[in-house]
Amino acid sequence: MEKNLKNIEFIAEIASSHNGSIKILRKLVEKLILSNVTSIKFQIFKLNKLAHPSYKFFNALKNISIPSQAYKAIINKVLKSKKKVILEPFDNESFEFCKKFKKKVSVKISSSDNDNIDLIKTSLKYFDKVFISISGYKISSVEKLFKKLNRSKRVIFTYGFQSFPTDYRNLRMGFLKELKQKNMRVCYADHTSRDNIFE
């Protein structure tokens, strides 16, 4: 058991916890660089490429948007610290931005694109690893996708229950175990409350 635990990597996803503040984003990154997390994950989007001004959540997205140039400096800082970086682009322009880092970073395919085979195959050409969300998938569907991707060991299937806070009683952990038995690499993600994680 101890040997298996040593192989577990922990990812800290910043998401929108910076509230659109570059200053807060920098502080979060500085704290995470000093922590024991393995990777730091960023969500990247270009506001005018992601949503139309008429979209009801446009202003909310505007309030949490960070310019790509700011991300560039911060990502380079993380890479210099030897922490791993995972980027999740939400539009084509952001994807092109992520490609500039090439194999230095990994990429997460957003749920809306997890059946976009061309995008996934392009990602495998440019990035170190490719994380693909499979929440809601059946084992047979994951197997078909894995086969289409030539059973690449650089593909990491990401499963999680995304309600907040996540109720661990609703999780299908046996699902992940079955995927591992089929020689697939897996990642678990949730929104567990820090207050009830050990209940």
What spans do the regions from the language model cover?
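Catalytic cores and adjacent flexible loops of soluble metabolic enzymes
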Residues: 1-199
